[in-house]
């Protein structure tokens, strides 16, 4: 699907093997339209935004704010002012962890996360536990990577102030029932944040349908540039939360005695934004929409189903997470026999196959699974069944070496 839009996919690895890029859960490749748009802005429109009356600044500002509107429509946000640009999902979660805790939580108050969280949705809360004395509680999961919703319900107390969970596990591929998770939180009058880093690239997101209070995702995992991400937050919370950082562009007025802050979303966007990256993100979204989000999801789900089917024919294959492709996204973590994940990944690389190895920034999940790491293959819209066949053949070649 649209492989011709990604020049890097035609290169040879070690001057011999065609690139089989299956590390999309870490970052995706970028289509020419994104690269060309960013280059064009640097060449012809480069100027700081929000700060100039001259033509270039106004043109750059229009592109930057136009990107915000593109994001608003992409995830179906009611108000553009509820879209905050960040450096990525990690910064978005850190922003909420810092500012929400400052505004709404006290020592002994609790936040609920899950067993399958990325470190970016664990460490920020632990930092707040050390600073503010909040308590982090964890939703358990089954052996096949499904969250225990009954146990989740039992975690709520009168001190629970926030739930923050991943939409899709970056290790297991599990698609969590976020609408149910949010509904249960709201039944306890608790707001809920969703980490959408692994879902926004692969499925249509409607934050009003999910009814989450915060939603975060990254541009580079969905064919956009690095260093740009998005935090959606409901106005009623963002208005009460203090700024995450101070500096230019987030102020109303400044005196040596007191500073007032800009209106949303600028209160949370201190300093010069990466306005070239926001333009690139908008172009990536437009690229995905041009193909069709449902078409992308169907293609990747079929690819995942086929990969699960073919990989399970390999003796000693152990796949983590749900084996039903309907319950998971385009991520497959695996081990084969006693072969170390680093050995498998290194030898696959020698065949031109790019996969990710290690704990995938999810060490607590690895401990729950009783392992220290996996090999992870993750798919994007440009992957195909021939590449899955190459992966399976490569795994078999590696197995034959041990």
Protein language model features and the residues they cover:
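Pyridoxal 5′-phosphate
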Residues: 1-402
